[in-house]
């Protein structure tokens, strides 16, 4: 191997060489490759491409030219790097989903939002867009400095005039050495309004600037969640902006829904987003999606359709998609740009200040250039005027001269002309000697004098120059400004939960005997008069019926207490919303019940962390327990123990209390005991409890409720055969915990055993559910008020083998208050006898007809007389029993 000549070998320490070479490389990447200039918002490769297009005359009014021709010209003259890097930069400037205001007008395949690459440069064509001309306008009027290209044979601009704020309009992104930039695009109208406000008030604050510039405006539209990230980025130059797709939930028939995505976040690859959704569905991380397809087209724009299973909650699925897929992502703002050739982190105001200063410089240099040109032209015109005034002498002098040089010198000496003036006279054509041409020269000269005065006035007064900048920016705003694409949604979105996407509304959750659960809007049911047939609430399976019902808000917690004394928790919206006739979904799909475990009580709670509330439990054997609500704030999906009891016992009911209530416990044989809650010592979550009521043989607890000490509430009793009544709470005296209680109704074959004992105010509605799935909604005020021992009046007519399975209270809403009360009318026949009364129950729910029931008045009167007699006998029997107990 031949040795290298000694003169070409330079021995250096490797550490020093690596340090210096890396610094040189790093500085080259920072200042000449990866970071944009704060003035025109362009990196060198983009600036060279646009300048090359301008030099080749590829303006919007000219035909397209091959991309390969553009790339080759730029690479050969200005950018000695790979042709693919130049082409990729040009392609990006042509993509309307990458640039808010594209700078290249491409023809052919220039890629897609799915990450598809552009066609080869030999196939595509390009030219400048109209707005690009504003970046290059006045570039030939000495408005910017030119520098040598890489080999010194060409000149290229160091910066473009940039007649609009391109740095913020189209944004920028790039990775340098030790730093990176990521600037979001903005709306041109808002940006120019911000620059105008800054020009009028240099001390303007960023908060005031944000009145003009709301926030980033992405080319793919979408949503921005909140303004806190925007404000932080504008104030410090760094911040995180939450972006979200625009998605709507559509009905697709048969009670099914679909999620349709029409806008996606900026820089999100649509194809990868769809793949991510499919992956989550395949891995069972998101449940309820049956189909996923991309229906995007040139006609419809972006359209990604996600079909949702009938029993799934589309809103919750959408929220999960936001959390786990690029449907929602963040844009990390890092506003680093080159300021005076050095990288600097800038905020919003600094970016606008530097741009405004650049525009003032451009306009000033352009004015100076125009002034020089105007003065030069005026100087020539002055020479022509002299020549016209002495035309004969001028001609004689020229004729006497032997050469052009002699003629020029003679003209200069004789008429005191400059070299340029003398040359202009020599170049003047004979036709300029006519009178008409003389008038034109005079007019042009006078116009030039006025123009020179205007230019000098601009240069003499900074405010006049600034107003010229404002006028030109306003003109650009009016020509190219457009409406915002990205919507900014205000609100706290930093820690999004499921309920943030779900409107808060009153709902009804029903649970069937075979553990099928669903939810419905409470407005599904309308108030009816007592005695009505009701509304079909669900189509139950064979031997199944609605066993429990509770009303709550979609944002409330639902605590599920089981017969085995365990507790589970769901949010209201987590229960699928289904049609009124749907049977629901198996409850085991929502909560993880153990074998042979049945839900005995559902209650709604807004704040599980409350220290002022308690839960009171009652078991079938008469055991009660009080426990702080906060003991149940952390419930796992597999549940926790809520109360312990003997094997032959089970949990009947749970109530939420304030700690100062009276406890009412009712039994199936119509016994009721009332005692102060304060007599119950708070116990731990897994404690057993104490005796609440002493039960007679064959009796069991069926109801638990609470009332205030001086309550004007009433005790509502409903029996299994559809009878009910109201009795004032104060008719039930306070007694010691553990007693046998007092009678609250007379049990006969006619009305049956008690199925519900609860307290009411008279301002609620009552929802009664039968084992056949029929639901009726009544105004509690329509139910008769009777004594403790009365049997009650008929609330709902039952068919064969039907019985009341559950009862729930519903708060009256505005819709029910506006409903017209259905009237029961009584008519008298011509012979004076009272005809049968007909109660018409109007079910206004769509798809249901008017139901008509015949009520026998004689039967009702007889029932009333029997109730009065029975009430008297029961009171006598109670007094005798009480005396025996006291003895």
Curated annotation (Swiss-Prot):
The active site is at 123 (o-(5'-phospho-dna)-tyrosine intermediate). SMART domains: TOP4c (SM00434). HAMAP family: GyrA. It comes from the Bacteria. A type II topoisomerase that negatively supercoils closed circular double-stranded (ds) DNA in an ATP-dependent manner to modulate DNA topology and maintain chromosomes in an underwound state. Negative supercoiling favors strand separation, and DNA replication, transcription, recombination and repair, all of which involve strand separation. Also able to catalyze the interconversion of other topological isomers of dsDNA rings, including catenanes and knotted rings. Type II topoisomerases break and join 2 DNA strands simultaneously in an ATP-dependent manner. It catalyses: ATP-dependent breakage, passage and rejoining of double-stranded DNA. Residues 813-823 have a biased composition (Acidic residues). CDD domains: TOP4c. Its EC number is 5.6.2.2. This is DNA gyrase subunit A. Heterotetramer, composed of two GyrA and two GyrB chains. In the heterotetramer, GyrA contains the active site tyrosine that forms a transient covalent intermediate with DNA, while GyrB binds cofactors and catalyzes ATP hydrolysis. Few gyrases are as efficient as E.coli at forming negative supercoils. Not all organisms have 2 type II topoisomerases; in organisms with a single type II topoisomerase this enzyme also has to decatenate newly replicated chromosomes. It comes from Staphylococcus aureus (strain USA300). One of its GO terms (molecular function) is ATP binding. The gene is gyrA. It is found in: Cytoplasm. One of its GO terms (biological process) is DNA topological change. It is an enzyme of class 5 (isomerase). InterPro entries: GyrA, GyrA/parC_rep, Gyrase/topoIV_suA_C, Topo_IIA-like_dom_sf, Topo_IIA_A/C_ab, Topo_IIA_A_a_sf, Topo_IIA_dom_A, Type_II_DNA_Topoisomerases. GO terms for cellular component: chromosome; cytoplasm; DNA topoisomerase type II (double strand cut, ATP-hydrolyzing) complex. Belongs to the type II topoisomerase GyrA/ParC subunit family. Residues 35-501 form the Topo IIA-type catalytic domain. Residues 811-864 are annotated as: Disordered. The record marks 84 as: Confers resistance to the antibiotic ciprofloxacin. A motif (GyrA-box) lies at residues 528-534. Pfam families: DNA_gyraseA_C, DNA_topoisoIV. Keywords: Antibiotic resistance, ATP-binding, Cytoplasm, DNA-binding, Isomerase, Nucleotide-binding, Topoisomerase.
């Amino acid at each position: 191997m031949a040795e290298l000549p000694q003169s070409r070998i330079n021995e250096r320490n490797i550490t020093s060489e690596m340090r210096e070479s890396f610094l040189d490389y790093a500085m080259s990447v920072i200042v000449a490759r990866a970071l944009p200039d704060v003035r025109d918002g362009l990196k060198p490769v983009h600036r060279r491409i646009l300048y090359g297009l301008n030099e080749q005359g590829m303006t919007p009014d000219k035909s397209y030219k091959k991309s390969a021709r553009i790339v080759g010209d730029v690479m050969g003259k200005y950018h000695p790097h790979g042709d693919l890097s130049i082409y990729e930069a040009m392609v990006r400037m042509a993509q309307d989903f990458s640039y808010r205001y594209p700078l290249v007008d491409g023809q052919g395949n220039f890629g897609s939002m799915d990450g598809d690459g552009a066609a080869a440069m030999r196939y595509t064509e390009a030219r400048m867009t109209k707005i690009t001309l504003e970046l290059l306008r006045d570039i030939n009027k000495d408005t910017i400095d030119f520098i040598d290209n890489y080999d010194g044979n060409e000149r290229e601009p160091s910066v473009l005039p940039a007649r609009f704020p391109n740095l913020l309009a189209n944004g920028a992104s790039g990775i340098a050495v030790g730093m990176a930039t990521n600037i979001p695009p903005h709306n041109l109208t808002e940006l120019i309004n911000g620059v105008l406000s800054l020009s009028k008030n240099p001390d303007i604050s960023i908060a005031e600037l944000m009145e003009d510039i709301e926030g980033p405006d992405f080319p793919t539209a979408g949503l921005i969640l909140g303004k806190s990230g925007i404000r932080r980025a504008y104030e410090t130059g760094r911040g995180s902006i939450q972006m979200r797709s625009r998605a709507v939930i559509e009905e697709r028939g048969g009670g099914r829904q679909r999620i349709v995505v029409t806008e996606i976040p900026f820089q999100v690859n649509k194809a990868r987003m769809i793949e991510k959704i499919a992956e989550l569905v395949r891995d069972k991380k998101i449940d309820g999606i049956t189909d996923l397809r991309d229906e995007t087209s040139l006609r419809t724009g972006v359209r990604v359709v996600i079909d949702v299973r009938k029993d799934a909650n589309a809103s919750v699925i959408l929220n999960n998609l936001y959390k786990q897929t690029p449907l929602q992502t963040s844009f990390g703002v890092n506003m680093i740009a080159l300021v005076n050739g050095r990288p600097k982190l800038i905020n919003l105001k600094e970016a606008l200040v530097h741009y405004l200063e650049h525009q003032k410089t451009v306009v000033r240099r352009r004015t100076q250039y125009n002034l020089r040109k105007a003065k030069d032209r005026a100087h020539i015109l002055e020479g022509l005027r002299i020549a016209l005034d002495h035309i004969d002498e001028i001609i004689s002098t020229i004729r006497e001269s032997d050469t052009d040089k002699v003629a020029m010198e003679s003209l200069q000496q004789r008429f005191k002309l400059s070299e340029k003036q003398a040359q202009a006279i020599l170049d003047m054509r004979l036709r300029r000697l006519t009178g008409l041409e003389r008038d034109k020269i005079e007019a042009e000269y006078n116009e030039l004098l006025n123009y020179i005065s205007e230019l000098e006035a601009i240069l003499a007064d900074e405010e006049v120059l600034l107003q010229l900048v404002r006028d030109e920016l306003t003109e650009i705003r009016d020509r190219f400004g457009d409406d915002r694409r990205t919507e900014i949604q205000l609100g706290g979105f930093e820690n999004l939960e499921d309920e943030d996407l779900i409107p808060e509304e009153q709902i009804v959750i029903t649970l069937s005997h075979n553990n099928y659960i669903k939810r419905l809007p409470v407005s599904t049911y309308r108030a009816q008069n007592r005695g009505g047939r009701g509304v079909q609430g669900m189509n139950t399976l064979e031997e199944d019926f609605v066993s429990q019902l509770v009303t709550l808000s979609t944002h409330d917690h639902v605590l599920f207490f089981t017969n085995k004394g365990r507790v589970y928790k769901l949010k209201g919206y987590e229960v699928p919303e289904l049609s009124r006739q749907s049977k629901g979904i198996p409850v085991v799909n929502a909560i993880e019940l153990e074998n042979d475990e049945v839900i005995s009580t559902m209650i709604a709670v807004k704040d599980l962390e409350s220290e002022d509330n308690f839960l009171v439990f009652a078991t079938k054997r008469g055991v009660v327990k009080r426990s702080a609500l906060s003991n149940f704030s952390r419930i796992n999906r597999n549940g926790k123990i809520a109360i312990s009891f003997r094997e032959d016992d089970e949990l009947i009911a749970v109530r939420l209390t304030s700690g100062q209530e009276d406890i009412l416990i009712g039994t199936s044989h119509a016994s009721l005991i009332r005692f102060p809650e304060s007599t119950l010592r708070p116990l731990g979550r897994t404690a057993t409890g104490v005796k609440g009521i002493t039960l007679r043989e064959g009796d069991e607890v069926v109801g638990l409720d609470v009332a205030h000490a001086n309550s004007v509430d009433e005790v509502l009793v409903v029996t299994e055969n559809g009878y009910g009544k109201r009795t004032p709470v104060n008719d039930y005296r306070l007694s010691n915990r553990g007693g046998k209680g007092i009678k609250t109704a007379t049990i006969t074959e006619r009305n049956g055993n008690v199925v519900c004992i609860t307290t009411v105010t008279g301002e609620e509605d009552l929802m009664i559910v039968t084992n056949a799935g029929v639901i009726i909604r009544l105004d509690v005020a329509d139910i008769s008020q009777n004594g403790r021992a009365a049997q009650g009046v008929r609330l709902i007519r039952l068919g064969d083998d039907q019985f009341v399975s559950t009862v729930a209270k519903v708060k009256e809403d505005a819709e029910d208050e506006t409903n017209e009360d259905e009237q029961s009318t009584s008519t008298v026949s011509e012979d004076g006898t009272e005809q049968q009364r007909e109660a018409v129950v109007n079910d206004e729910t769509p798809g249901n007809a008017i139901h008509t029931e015949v009520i026998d008045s004689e039967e009702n009167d007889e029932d009333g007389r029997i109730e009065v007699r029975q009430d008297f006998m029961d009171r006598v029997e109670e007094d005798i029993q009480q005396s025996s107990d006291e003895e």
